[in-house]
Every structure is written in structure tokens, then in C-alpha cells.
């Protein structure tokens, strides 16, 4: 399962991730603080920040291991509900959320258009009328031009890793092969993981959103308020649930 070993080192490896920028983008994109669903919430970093800002937060993730770490961070003053579910099949929350967010390119872990469509339909069901969907994805440029044949590495006393990326077999997909070396007090334990991500052109995301009952309001790039360019690497989408009923 994705993140089975990754969960134990995820927070340390992501210690410099721009979580505050994601939170700022979410706040700026929503008209008021209401009930929000953080899909693919991971270890809860964004969920916790949103709760601190005054949102009523529910976090959902596929990984039980990630959710275990998320739950350990929550204090009694932050009543965040964390649940293990598949974002393509959210159950128990029909019409309950003012907004749904899918951050940190989590949507790129869905390998097919049908997976994305099922996720959008699932989100549509749990949103209140005219609720907001916010998500970010890697751009086509980043998947096709930046990641392939790239190697990332880092080393310190506790954790070291080698991260190699290469083009996947599907269009606009990439494979990440990762090897981690974690100090256990006496020696280094090694574990390996392979993750696959895929993206789609903006026009295809817009079409999928429309077919699932959403109106696309805006697409921006790289934590700015500007429209994407040919070299933008991360795209941010804001869509709103229309009055159309999707079965």
C-alpha cells in the first residue's frame, strides 16, 4: 500500500513543505469558515492548521498508518475527526460540507480519468449546495519535463534517502522509486517504496469537473494569484458545486 513505510518518515521529509501557504490559499478561497473536509489528509498537517483557523475539520485518508500519526498530533482543544476511507467512495457525509480540499498533489495518485471522475462525484455528494472544491495538481510540464530522469537525495544522522523519478507508461505519468535509510539506534534500516503519479491537461480537468456537476471558477499557479504559464509546476483549482444532480 502507498505510504505503508513512508508514514514513519513522512513528517521529517516534509518538514519544509509549504503547509502554511496551502492553508492561506484555502482561507483566501472560501467566503467563510465552515465545515471542511480534508481529503487525502495524510498526517494531518493541513487539517490541524485549518482547525486552528476556526474551521470545523474532518480528515480522510486511505492510509491507516498516516492517520495514526495525524491522530497523535491532535489535542483535546482540536476536535478533528480522522477517518480511513477511499476518496472515490466517501460515505456517511452526504450534503454536509461547505468545502472539500485535496492538497499536496494527492489527486495525482489517481491513475485513471475514471478514478478522478469518481472522486469528483464523491465530492459532489458530500458538499452542500454551492459548496466549494479546492485541489492542486502537478502540471503537465512538471510531470513530462521536470520529474523524468531526476534524482533527489538527502542525508542526515537519522534519515537519508535517494529518490529517482522516471516517465511512466501512461501519458503524463511518472514513477518515483525511493529508498530510505532510517537510524534505529544501532544501525540503519532500509525500506523501498514506489509511487506513481499522473496528471491531465487543465482542459481535461475542467471537462471532468463540468461532467460531475461543478463549475470551474479559477485556475492559478505555484501559490500565486496568476494564471498558469507553460512552465508552471503546480496548478490550483477552485470549483463550485452547481445545482445539477449527479447520480
UniProtKB/Swiss-Prot annotation:
Disulfide bonds: none
Annotated GO MF terms: methyltransferase activity
InterPro entries assigned to the protein according to its UniProt record, in alphabetical order: Methyltransf_25, SAM-dependent_MTases_sf
Pfam families documented for this protein: Methyltransf_25 (PF13649)
Record GO biological process: methylation
Keywords noted in UniProt: Methyltransferase, S-adenosyl-L-methionine, Transferase
Keyword set includes Transferase: yes
Keyword Methyltransferase: yes
Role summary: May be a S-adenosyl-L-methionine (SAM)-dependent methyltransferase.
Protein name: Putative methyltransferase YqeM
Organism: Bacillus subtilis (strain 168)
Amino acid at each position: 500500500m502507498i505510504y505503508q513505510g513512508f508514514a514513519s518518515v513522512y513528517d521529517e521529509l516534509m518538514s519544509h513543505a509549504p503547509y502554511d501557504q496551502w492553508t492561506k490559499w484555502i482561507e483566501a478561497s472560501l467566503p467563510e469558515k465552515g465545515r471542511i473536509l480534508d481529503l487525502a489528509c495524510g498526517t494531518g498537517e493541513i487539517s490541524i492548521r485549518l482547525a486552528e483557523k476556526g474551521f470545523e475539520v474532518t480528515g480522510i485518508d486511505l492510509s491507516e498508518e498516516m492517520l495514526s500519526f495525524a491522530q497523535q498530533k491532535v489535542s483535546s482543544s482540536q476536535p478533528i475527526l480522522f477517518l480511513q476511507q477511499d476518496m472515490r467512495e466517501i460515505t456517511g457525509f452526504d450534503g454536509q460540507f461547505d468545502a472539500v480540499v485535496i492538497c499536496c498533489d494527492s489527486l495525482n495518485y489517481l491513475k485513471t480519468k475514471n478514478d478522478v471522475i469518481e472522486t469528483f462525484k464523491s465530492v459532489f455528494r458530500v458538499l452542500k449546495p454551492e459548496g466549494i472544491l479546492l485541489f492542486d495538481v502537478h502540471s503537465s510540464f512538471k510531470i513530462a519535463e521536470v520529474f523524468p530522469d531526476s534524482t533527489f537525495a538527502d542525508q542526515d544522522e537519522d534519515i537519508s534517502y535517494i529518490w529517482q523519478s522516471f516517465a511512466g507508461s501512461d501519458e503524463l505519468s511518472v514513477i518515483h522509486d525511493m529508498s530510505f535509510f532510517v537510524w534505529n539506534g544501532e544501525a540503519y534500516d532500509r525500506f523501498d517504496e514506489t509511487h506513481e503519479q499522473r496528471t491531465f491537461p487543465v482542459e481535461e480537468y475542467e471537462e471532468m469537473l463540468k461532467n460531475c456537476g461543478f463549475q470551474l471558477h479559477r485556475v492559478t499557479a505555484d501559490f500565486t494569484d496568476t494564471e498558469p504559464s507553460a512552465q508552471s509546476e503546480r496548478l490550483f483549482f477552485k470549483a463550485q458545486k452547481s445545482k445539477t444532480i449527479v447520480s
